[in-house]
């Protein structure tokens, strides 16, 4: 029996434990990739099965937690009960430069703290009062976003009307975002709603700071600067002669967002969360966009050359110089870590782009991806994934806690790379684990400098001597 058939049988064994209706539903989300096919063969972006443990988030998480929250010079109000703001408070490690509480506010939590009376009588007056208090207490803020939670949508509060009034009072952008958590099937719709808010409430403004443009102006979009990722990417782009005019949302500002329609090229890192606004700018302003990948030296060089190909010979020559500059550093990293990591197997399950984009970094270290999947991918994500995975790779969409544990128990990977919800489950099973949402409090992982840290962290995870003291359940 081939490996493909083995793994298809594994999927069937897992499905056999479910009731018939659930098994039929989940069977559409699990598959084994077969080389040569142009799709991973799984359904996606569908409501999770009721009653199963899913790692997904909500639309509010996608808007406030991913797209808007990292804009550092704005104050983001979690408009609704206190819990949503509390549990989304500074959890993403979006690094930024500034003085917190004075001119930057990324790690602060602002909430309208809805009470029963606000549900009964509405919260519009309270919200307007909050915007006035914010302006008084934090006068150096450059704008406010209103991130609406579930009750706000259910009672029909007019946050758009409040935003317009607040803008007249403060003279600054006040952006209403209808990202109530019940919308859509995952955080993915929150990304889309947040993108639409940028389109309707930011790009439509005419008060952006005037800047001189150059033929080399670019924007980094969809890099949230986890552990400094955007900084390590920006270094390479600037070394090859490009001018990064805007960087959002990680370490980004509202003015940078306003400037973006003036750039010559949008460089998109997280396709899933920011492709909507990139496509809009392509259609309205004629700005092309390119999805780059700065995970691992192979893809870094490939992306730099592809970006340079969109500019003149000077940029093309500079790109080659940048690649050459880091060859020695990369060779030293590979010489040190590849022998220690060669042929180790990995299973991954994350959101966004990482289930495919991080694969080349593992491959550069000689590691093999045997299973990967997304929390909230769409069909085009799985089409893009075929470029990154090998024959017989297990593919799982919106995988349940039960499925993921069973797959790991059977395939016995050397390393599991997933989120904080999964971290302690697998560590208690005696498996090395890396948290791939926030880089396990390390990073950056982007760029050549980031690859050195990535390699070190994988080595620390896999070759830590403590694992020899713990027996996996299947070895007892």
UniProtKB/Swiss-Prot annotation:
Enzyme class label: oxidoreductase
EC number assigned by the record: 1.18.6.1
Gene name of this polypeptide: nifD
Self-association and partners: Tetramer of two alpha and two beta chains. Forms complex with the iron protein (nitrogenase component 2).
Any one of the GO BP annotations: nitrogen fixation
Cofactor: [8Fe-7S] cluster; [7Fe-Mo-9S-C-homocitryl] cluster
Cofactor notes: Binds 1 [8Fe-7S] cluster per heterodimer. Binds 1 [7Fe-Mo-9S-C-homocitryl] cluster per subunit.
The protein's name in its UniProt record: Nitrogenase molybdenum-iron protein alpha chain
Domain of life, per lineage: Bacteria
Entry keywords, A to Z: ATP-binding, Iron, Iron-sulfur, Metal-binding, Molybdenum, Nitrogen fixation, Nucleotide-binding, Oxidoreductase
Pfam families: Oxidored_nitro (PF00148)
Binding-site list for [8Fe-7S] cluster: 58, 84, 150
Catalytic activity as recorded in UniProt: N2 + 8 reduced [2Fe-2S]-[ferredoxin] + 16 ATP + 16 H2O = H2 + 8 oxidized [2Fe-2S]-[ferredoxin] + 2 NH4(+) + 16 ADP + 16 phosphate + 6 H(+)
One GO cellular component, as annotated: molybdenum-iron nitrogenase complex
Described purpose of this protein according to its UniProt entry: This molybdenum-iron protein is part of the nitrogenase complex that catalyzes the key enzymatic reactions in nitrogen fixation.
Gene Ontology molecular function terms on file: ATP binding; iron-sulfur cluster binding; metal ion binding; nitrogenase activity
Lineage: Bacteria, Bacillati, Cyanobacteriota, Cyanophyceae, Oscillatoriophycideae
Binding-site list for [7Fe-Mo-9S-C-homocitryl] cluster: 270, 437
Family: Belongs to the NifD/NifK/NifE/NifN family.
């Amino acid at each position: 029996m081939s490996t493909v058939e083995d793994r298809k049988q594994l999927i069937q064994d897992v499905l056999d434990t479910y009731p018939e209706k659930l098994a039929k539903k989940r069977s559409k989300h699990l598959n084994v990739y077969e080389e040569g096919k142009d799709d991973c063969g799984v359904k996606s972006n569908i409501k999770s099965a009721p009653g199963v443990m899913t790692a997904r988030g909500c639309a509010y998480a996608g808007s406030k937690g991913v797209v808007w929250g990292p804009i550092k010079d704005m104050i983001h109000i979690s408009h609704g009960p206190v819990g949503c703001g509390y549990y989304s408070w500074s959890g993403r490690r979006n690094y930024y430069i500034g003085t917190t509480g004075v001119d930057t506010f990324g790690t602060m939590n602002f909430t309208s703290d809805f009470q029963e009376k606000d549900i009964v009588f509405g919260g519009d007056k309270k919200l307007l009062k909050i915007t006035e208090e914010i302006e008084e207490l934090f006068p150096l803020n450059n704008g406010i976003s209103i991130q609406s939670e579930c009750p706000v949508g259910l009672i029909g509060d007019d946050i758009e009307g409040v935003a317009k009034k607040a803008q007249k009072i403060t003279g600054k952008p006040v952006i209403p975002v209808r990202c109530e958590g019940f919308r859509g099937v995952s955080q993915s719709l929150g990304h889309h709603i947040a993108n639409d808010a940028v389109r309707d409430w930011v790009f439509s403004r005419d008060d952006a700071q005037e800047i001189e443009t150059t033929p080399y102006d670019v924007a980094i979009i969809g890099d949230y600067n986890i552990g400094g990722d955007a900084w390590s990417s920006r270094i390479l782009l600037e070394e090859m002669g490009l001018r990064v005019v805007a960087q959002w949302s990680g370490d980004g500002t509202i003015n940078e967002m306003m400037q973006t329609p003036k750039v010559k090229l949008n460089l998109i890192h997280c396709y899933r969360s920011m492709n909507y606004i990139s496509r809009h700018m392509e259609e309205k302003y004629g700005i092309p966009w390119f999805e780059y990948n700065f995970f691992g030296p192979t893809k870094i060089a490939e992306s730099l050359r592809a970006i340079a190909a969109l500019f003149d010979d000077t940029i093309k020559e500079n790109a080659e110089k940048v690649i050459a500059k880091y060859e020695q550093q990369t060779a030293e990293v590979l010489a040190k870590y590849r022998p220690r990591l060669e042929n180790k197997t990995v299973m991954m399950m994350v959101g966004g782009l990482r289930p495919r984009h991080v694969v080349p970094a593992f491959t550069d270290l000689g590691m093999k991806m045997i299973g990967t999947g997304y929390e909230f991918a769409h069909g085009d994500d799985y089409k893009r994934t075929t470029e990154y995975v090998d024959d017989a790779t297990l593919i799982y969409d919106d995988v349940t806690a039960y499925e993921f544990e069973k797959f790991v128990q059977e395939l016995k990977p050397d390393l599991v790379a997933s989120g904080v919800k999964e971290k302690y489950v697998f560590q208690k099973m005696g498996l090395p684990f890396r948290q791939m949402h926030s880089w396990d409090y390390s990073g950056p992982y982007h760029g050549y400098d980031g690859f050195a840290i990535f390699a070190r962290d994988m080595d620390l995870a896999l070759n830590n001597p403590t694992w020899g003291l713990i027996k996996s359940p299947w070895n007892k």
